[in-house]
């Protein structure tokens, strides 16, 4: 099987980002975004999805976290999309319901090439360790856009902001683990193209 590894970079006046992913990795990561809680979430995503992620970002955090969070998602999504190649043999779909103490999150994903994100969650705290919680939804929207994925995320239960966000990232991780898994030899579509 061809190695499913890809790198993608983006440099603007606001951010300078490089990401490398290995879809058939062991969940190792080296994440540096400058946003402590985002680093924690991406490390958790890597560990639980089994996708190796190397990501470095230098952003205009003196302004706020918006550009960094958005651009990290755009670059990570594009690297994953490129690593998927022609998507021959992948499961394509993945889903997970993940608890974290009182929090319960659900994620369903379709890697079929149609970008759309539905996000249903509310957070009590406006900021957690440098991450504006309003940017969590924007992260997933941006990720789905460049990953060309249909992504549905929802909080089913919970109150603690840390637990809610971490459960969302872990549910994405387990859904991705399933969706990128190679289990056949054909493109998983009646169109024979994704």
Swiss-Prot record:
Record localization: Cytoplasm
Q: Name one Pfam family in it.
A: IGPD
* Single GO MF annotation: imidazoleglycerol-phosphate dehydratase activity
Record field: catalytic activity: D-erythro-1-(imidazol-4-yl)glycerol 3-phosphate = 3-(imidazol-4-yl)-2-oxopropyl phosphate + H2O
Q: GO BP, one example?
A: L-histidine biosynthetic process
Q: What's the source species for this entry?
A: Chlorobaculum parvum (strain DSM 263 / NCIMB 8327)
Give the matching Gene3D superfamilies.
Imidazole glycerol phosphate dehydratase, domain 1 (3.30.230.40)
Q: Which gene encodes it?
A: hisB
EC numbers? 4.2.1.19
User: Which is one Gene Ontology cellular component term of this protein?
Assistant: cytoplasm
Q: Which InterPro entries match?
A: IGPD_sf, ImidazoleglycerolP_deHydtase, ImidazoleglycerP_deHydtase_CS, Ribosomal_Su5_D2-typ_SF
User: Which UniProt key words apply to this protein?
Assistant: Amino-acid biosynthesis, Cytoplasm, Histidine biosynthesis, Lyase
Protein name (database record): Imidazoleglycerol-phosphate dehydratase
Its family? Answer: Belongs to the imidazoleglycerol-phosphate dehydratase family.
Q: Write out the pathway annotation from the protein's UniProt entry.
A: Amino-acid biosynthesis; L-histidine biosynthesis; L-histidine from 5-phospho-alpha-D-ribose 1-diphosphate: step 6/9
Transmembrane segments in this chain: where? none
EC supergroup of this enzyme? lyase
């Amino acid at each position: 099987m061809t190695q499913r590894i890809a790198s993608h970079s983006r440099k603007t006046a606001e951010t300078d980002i490089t990401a490398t992913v290995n879809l058939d990795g062991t969940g190792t990561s080296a994440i540096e975004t400058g946003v402590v809680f985002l680093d924690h979430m991406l490390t958790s995503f890597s560990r639980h999805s089994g996708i190796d992620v190397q990501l470095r970002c230098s952003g205009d955090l003196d302004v706020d976290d918006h550009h960094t969070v958005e651009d990290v998602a755009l670059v990570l999504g594009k690297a994953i999309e490129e690593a998927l190649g022609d998507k021959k043999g992948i499961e394509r779909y993945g889903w997970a319901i993940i608890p974290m103490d009182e929090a319960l999150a659900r994620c369903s994903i379709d890697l079929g090439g149609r970008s759309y994100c539905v996000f249903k969650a509310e957070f009590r705290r406006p900021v957690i360790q440098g991450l504006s919680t309003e940017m969590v939804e924007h992260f997933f929207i941006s990720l789905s856009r460049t990953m060309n994925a249909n992504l549905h995320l929802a909080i089913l239960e919970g109150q603690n902001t840390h637990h809610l966000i971490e459960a969302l990232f872990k549910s994405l991780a387990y859904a991705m683990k399933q969706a990128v898994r190679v289990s056949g030899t054909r493109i998983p579509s009646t169109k024979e193209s994704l």
